[in-house]
Amino acid sequence: MNIRSNPDTTLPAVTTGPLPSSRKIYAVPDSAPDLRVPLREIILSEAASEPNLPVYDTSGPYTDPSVTIDVNAGLPRNRIAWVLERGGVEEYVGRDIKPEDNGNVGADKAAKAFTAHHKPLRGLDGHKITQLEFARAGIVTKEMIYVAERENLGRKVQLERAEAALADGESFGASVPAFITPEFVRDEIARGRAIIPCNINHAELEPMIIGRNFLTKINANIGNSAVTSSVEEEVDKMVWAIRWGADTVMDLSTGRNIHTTREWILRNSPVPIGTVPIYQALEKCNGDPVALTWELYKDTLIEQCEQGVDYFTIHAGVRLQYIHLTASRVTGIVSRGGSIMAKWCLAHHKESFLYTHFDEICDIMRKYDVSFSLGDGLRPGSIADANDRAQFAELETLGELTKIAWDKGCQVMIEGPGHVPMHKIKINMDKQLKECGEAPFYTLGPLTTDIAPGYDHITSGIGAAMIGWFGCAMLCYVTPKEHLGLPDRNDVKTGVITYKIAAHAADLAKGHPAAQLRDDALSRARFEFRWTDQFNLGLDPDTAKSFHDETLPKEAHKVAHFCSMCGPKFCSMKITQDVRDYAATLNDPATVGMTISGTIEDGMAQMSAKFKEMGGSVYLDAEKVKESNKALS
Amino acid sequence: MNIRSNPDTTLPAVTTGPLPSSRKIYAVPDSAPDLRVPLREIILSEAASEPNLPVYDTSGPYTDPSVTIDVNAGLPRNRIAWVLERGGVEEYVGRDIKPEDNGNVGADKAAKAFTAHHKPLRGLDGHKITQLEFARAGIVTKEMIYVAERENLGRKVQLERAEAALADGESFGASVPAFITPEFVRDEIARGRAIIPCNINHAELEPMIIGRNFLTKINANIGNSAVTSSVEEEVDKMVWAIRWGADTVMDLSTGRNIHTTREWILRNSPVPIGTVPIYQALEKCNGDPVALTWELYKDTLIEQCEQGVDYFTIHAGVRLQYIHLTASRVTGIVSRGGSIMAKWCLAHHKESFLYTHFDEICDIMRKYDVSFSLGDGLRPGSIADANDRAQFAELETLGELTKIAWDKGCQVMIEGPGHVPMHKIKINMDKQLKECGEAPFYTLGPLTTDIAPGYDHITSGIGAAMIGWFGCAMLCYVTPKEHLGLPDRNDVKTGVITYKIAAHAADLAKGHPAAQLRDDALSRARFEFRWTDQFNLGLDPDTAKSFHDETLPKEAHKVAHFCSMCGPKFCSMKITQDVRDYAATLNDPATVGMTISGTIEDGMAQMSAKFKEMGGSVYLDAEKVKESNKALS
């Protein structure tokens, strides 16, 4: 990996270069030869008697050595042509950037503005704009072709194997197909079961799809808080998060420089960016929830639509009449957006303006194809509060709002908890599917216990794997810093890897046709002592190699038929291979399908003698290995 | 925490002293006032309006400042009196220690022998020796009284609350009672549904129970391999593992000094120690599985029975006729013991001597009350091999052997996988319960995917939580080093904490009457911004505090009503508390059970005005906090 040192030190330095033994490849869909759909090919060692493995690649141009990265200029804006060629949009002079957009930051503390300015696009009345509208009209967009190709992970149609995988899994009623076609994508979007978050102004985007009949996705939250962090750190975190597999990134920045931070992130992000607009709206009224107004909020929506944000978390389900339901909770309201709106509702004794103006919100978002992520402002914040009436009352309202947004032509997903013990997780998934007409579910964890601050990536990774299996479409990561502080770069990586594990475990359990290919490739590498392949096929080759190197650092150990865990004499894989090799030399079917039977006694006696003969020679000398390590260290 | 520096540097240095804000307390059972059952009391801050929280304590005398720890002398041998007073045992001159017991280690590499020598005890013919025999005879032993007290976590009988918790959980047919009595313990042991691993020669033991109607337990594997590690490191790892919550420890040492390492561990261990005797037997024939004999193995069993090992993993289910079933596996046989026995069976073309001599093995183990941990030598080593015929054929044989061992009066648990995707986990649990007559299940993970070497504590923590919920009685930890190298001290801690999370999440989901008390206490601390209480109530107070200190290091921040994650303006818990406090001042029931209704409009208008008045004053100034941090760092 190369850390790019930027000559201008005020600009973000980001990590570029391919992952170990990987190269970027691009698939070209038959139906759209101008598209280049990225994949990462993991290159196996010469000892491998199998092809290289293509895997899903969220990392964007940063891992393509042929692309020159200039954070100052942003990524290529390829997708603008797709939007323009289908028409129905206009370029216009966007809203001016005002001092309050950046929290009235003083000149001394203002972050450097992003250099380039792009005029925004918006939809014209009477024209189709959103992916949902195109899908319903039977039109397959380039975005749909792109994600179809991407979801197949570079494999060709192999119906028999794919169907066997599906039959072996348990998907709880999902309809994962053996192979993803653009038409399948279109159909799922038309039914509201999947979304492609893709603001027409986010031209740097490599489209991806969220829905339970596709690969399970993960989101990484970044963003500064009022207490710590900077623009540079946040852009770096975004690039770092997608390097390890984040499918979308939410910029949850608060405090000053909020507009500028988001601009830098968007112009450099190949993945969808989500935000919670109420955070910025609150900055515009100096942090006083009571002073929030619909006009301030609307202004913020338009500002962020023009920038290119792909999905908005909107807590429109926090209704005045539900707030008292949280009164007896152990941890009250734990959603930032939820608590802000609760305070507003109570202070004014009015229904939430997000609820009363929901129609208008839809009309704005539709013009830019910004997807809804209907926020769960009343999600539980502790095991004690899971699945209570407040939570489910809000979920029912989110179902009602889903249908309104769909009628308006908007794409929708639904946010979910939070903190839920294992036995109450499936109830959440089932109720969400029922109330929200199978709109994609997007949950935060859930944490399955509250007793491990510092390890909430794990308490929640358990719940995330389970709810992903049950049908959740996207899992919002939780880092080790959850409840304790703002995650740094290392926390972001740990959170992303943990959630890639959860998402992949879910895909495996659902029987996703391509999921087990990677497990099997890695298992074969492990069994055949191709250590380097084992590292490189894993989610984090750097960490795997460094752990191995701690005890067996020499290059020769990368082909050794053992590791330091058991040592050479006790390596079960080695012994098993000895057994197999030996059985093969006998070339006698009876040695494989062996039973205790007199008829093959002669063969067995011969086998027995040969084994004795092999004796000690099949093992390496452990003490010698130890000495050689000592000499080296 | 204090790191004990031993004046004699050739002896192990171990970690002593209480955990942060904790003190050791001892409960005295009504029915045995001479027993002192350890608990750890977490002392809450003065701001807490609730009592201190007692939690299960595996750490032994090491965390009791009133006990002087001398690793050279070993722990007090309190339990010897319990064994002697019930009679039926004899002291005798044990087997001599031979050079091959320590792998014929040369004088230059020999570890220092443990100083004290204790003559072993063994059962006399015609007398009851094992907990199973006593239980069946209706006799409640001190061990049973001890574990009953321990399992209740210091709580009194509160039937109503306990029954509500049980009713709220889903235990899949377990029979967890509202309160544990010694008679319940006796009955569960008599039925074979639980075991107390307690060799009569492990007099340092603080007894514990393993069974699905008790708290879910975890095991930590330690032990040197031929390539790395030393006696000192292993004793330190044992003490370190139990400090963080390991309920039992397996010494999986191989290589030289194997007898001496085990002696040091046993004499200093308050938790049950398990081993895999075939590892040492193999050392006695220079690592050649083909040269293994029943006599060598039997000699090893007696050696370890006399030392005080509490449970033996015995791979007696790896039968000759099953070995060919592994031929087409992706990863063959991955159990060390399983592969050793497979090689022996094939080389000799004979049934495994562990199977043919099973009766004799029972007779030996019964005399010392060593529990069986029937090994799963044919467990899957990859997702591809999960739940295959080889695995389940062996499990059926383990069921057959369970009944033989029970007939002989031995306590039994059953080992399980390994590598299993989520949707195939419950099948394992259900089949084990059926085949093995509800004998406790003890699984390694299982790992739910193979694609994350370096993170297998997480891939397996997911599976462990699930199988614990489904009924698994003990979860064998997996560390981040799994498949890559021998775990060090940090890996041991990470593995233990991860598995404490899994076990606790399982207990919560089962509805264990006492499990949620800790979650609720921590959640209340979190909501009330008692930061120090939040850290101390967690599984790893040191890590939680250090994460918090990274961004808010000052003592004043330990009472701040926000953290660096969201900052003061966006802290949902703060806002919620503001809302509640405000509602409380109105002293009007309508403000809690508020609805949109004209009748309380006046109250609401008043509320609205007051909220406006509170305005900006309820928030701390984020920028000021940031500055103060900068000044400090």
From Swiss-Prot, chains A, B:
An example of a GO molecular function for this protein is: 4 iron, 4 sulfur cluster binding
Biochemical pathway: Cofactor biosynthesis; thiamine diphosphate biosynthesis
Q: InterPro entries from the entry?
A: ThiC (IPR037509), ThiC-associated_dom (IPR025747), ThiC/Bza_core_dom (IPR038521), ThiC/BzaA/B (IPR002817)
Alphabetic keyword roster: 4Fe-4S, Iron, Iron-sulfur, Lyase, Metal-binding, S-adenosyl-L-methionine, Thiamine biosynthesis, Zinc
Please give the cofactor(s) recorded in the UniProt entry for this protein: [4Fe-4S] cluster
Which residues hold substrate?
N221, M250, Y279, H315, S335, R336, G337, D376, G377, L378, R379, E415, Y442
Question: Does the UniProt entry include the keyword Amino-acid biosynthesis?
Answer: no
Query: Which residue windows does the record flag with biased composition (Polar residues)?
Result: 1-13
Enzymatic class:
lyase
Q: Name the reaction it catalyses.
A: 5-amino-1-(5-phospho-beta-D-ribosyl)imidazole + S-adenosyl-L-methionine = 4-amino-2-methyl-5-(phosphooxymethyl)pyrimidine + CO + 5'-deoxyadenosine + formate + L-methionine + 3 H(+)
Q: Which GO terms describe its cellular component?
A: cytosol
**Sites where the protein binds Zn(2+):** H419, H483
Enzyme Commission designation: 4.1.99.17
Q: How does it assemble?
A: Homodimer.
Of which family is this protein a member? Belongs to the ThiC family.
Tell me, in a sentence or two, what this protein's role is: Catalyzes the synthesis of the hydroxymethylpyrimidine phosphate (HMP-P) moiety of thiamine from aminoimidazole ribotide (AIR) in a radical S-adenosyl-L-methionine (SAM)-dependent reaction.
Q: What is this protein called?
A: Phosphomethylpyrimidine synthase
Identify the gene encoding this protein.
Answer: thiC
